[in-house]
């Protein structure tokens, strides 16, 4: 296979164990999320609610049929070329007799109701809940991944829900959510599922949102933008070497994704996980903030998030709060107006202040929202429009 490593059926990377739902909750920093008690469980005679390795093969989008049953995937920058029976780098897309299939369509391994602030979205319907889904797999291999137990797994090794797109929308409505979020792993790898759900949200009064690393090719991104209302994108570092060594990817496609989403009018927030000694250099942070200001605009929300030792970086140390505060000062100095600190519950930098008059607009304590001073998307004090989505979708 050219362009990426071969993933054999059911194979896990060395040192990875099979995921249980309990382990996922325990291992995630988002342990406050609640596993949704699905109100529309199918009858046992028809199917089981959860099955290990459940799969619904679905013909993949963006594939190029080559000679001798070779298929090239055109979804992400890896552009994997696979022989019959092989999978791409993500571990969830497989060549079957010259046709590429997604193995995770309609079978997520994680279904949660989260505060929208957990994504994180600080400028999208504050205080609301988001119906959050993820499948096994990822097209990146971050050494610091917090959800590695599912992102680095194949669908054979996870317990999966039978949850087609229409049931996602029904579940979100039943749970009182105002949005659906494709999150926890890289949602690009369940592209067909994500876009199908996104199309259904349009007539259901739900926002379609994602938290992504932005590792996607231009053509599928243009189509995805049609069904997305908001996106949080991880800009893991402003350094190609960091992406190569710690992410197993490239920086340039992520920058292109950010610019495309801005151009297409998708609400955009950016997250940078600050890892001591790896991407916390002041000049690197200043350069990143200047790029965000110039290419995405000074009103783009930026979240500096605290690193905790996980996965292959468990011997490293958490980010000092002072490092995050210094990064925020650099961002403000560069001209960014909405700069937040994450994974530090109770810090004043969780709050939103008006870029016009500086007064408090939204008070937060972790994922909890307190006082709000917005009126129809504008500052209650000075009337300046605040970037974001503040009104429930009709």
Identify the meaning behind each predicted range.
Residues 16-23, 33-52:
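N-terminal twin-arginine translocation
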Residues 367-374:
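Short linker/helix segments within small regulatory modules
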Residues 162-322, 330:
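Conserved AdoMet/S-adenosylmethionine-binding subsite of the radical SAM
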Residues 1-19:
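N-terminal secretory signal peptides
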Residues 17, 47-72, 78-134, 149, ...:
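N-terminal [4Fe-4S]-dependent radical SAM core
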Residues 73, 142, 354-357, 379-382:
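Short cysteine-rich clusters marking metal-coordination/redox-active sites
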Residues 83-86, 153-154, 364-366, 389-392:
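Short Cys/His-rich "knuckle" micro-motifs
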Residues 102-183, 188, 194-195:
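Extended interfacial segments that mediate partner engagement and assembly in macromolecular machines
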């Amino acid at each position: 296979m050219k362009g990426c490593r071969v993933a054999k059926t059911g194979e896990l990377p060395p040192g990875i164990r099979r995921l249980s739902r309990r382990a996922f909750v325990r291992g995630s920093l988002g342990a406050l999320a609640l596993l949704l008690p699905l109100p529309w469980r199918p009858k046992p005679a028809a199917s089981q609610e959860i099955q290990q390795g459940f799969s619904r093969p679905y013909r993949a989008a963006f594939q190029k049929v080559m000679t001798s049953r070779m298929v090239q995937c055109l979804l992400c920058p890896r552009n994997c070329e696979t022989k019959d029976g092989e999978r791409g780098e993500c571990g969830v897309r497989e060549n079957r007799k010259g046709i590429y299939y997604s193995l995770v369509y309609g079978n997520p391994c994680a279904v949660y109701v989260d505060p929208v602030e957990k994504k994180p979205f600080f400028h999208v319907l504050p205080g609301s809940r988001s119906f959050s889904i993820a499948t096994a797999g990822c097209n990146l291999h971050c050494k610091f991944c917090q959800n590695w137990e599912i992102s680095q797994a194949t669908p054979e090794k996870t317990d999966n829900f039978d949850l087609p797109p229409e049931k996602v929308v029904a579940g979100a409505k039943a749970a009182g959510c105002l949005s659906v979020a494709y999150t926890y792993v890289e949602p690009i790898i369940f592209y067909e599922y994500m876009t199908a759900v996104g199309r259904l949200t349009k007539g259901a009064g739900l926002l379609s949102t994602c938290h992504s690393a932005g590792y996607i090719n231009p053509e599928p991104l243009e189509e995805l933008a049609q069904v997305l209302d908001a996106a949080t994108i991880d800009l893991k570092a402003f350094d190609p070497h960091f992406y190569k060594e710690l992410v197993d990817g490239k920086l340039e496609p992520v920058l292109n994704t950010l610019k495309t989403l801005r151009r297409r009018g998708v609400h955009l927030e950016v997250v940078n996980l600050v890892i001591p000694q790896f991407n916390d250099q002041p000049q690197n942070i200043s350069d990143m903030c200047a790029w965000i200001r110039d290419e995405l605009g000074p009103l783009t929300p930026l979240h500096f998030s605290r690193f905790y030792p996980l996965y292959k970086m468990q011997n490293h140390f958490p980010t000092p709060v002072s490092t995050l505060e210094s990064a925020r000062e650099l961002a403000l100095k560069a001209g960014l107006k909405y700069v937040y600190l994450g994974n530090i519950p109770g810090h004043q930098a969780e709050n939103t202040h008006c870029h016009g008059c500086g007064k408090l607009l939204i008070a937060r304590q972790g994922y909890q929202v307190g006082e709000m001073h917005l009126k129809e998307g504008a500052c209650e004090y000075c009337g300046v429009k605040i970037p974001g989505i503040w009104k429930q979708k009709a």
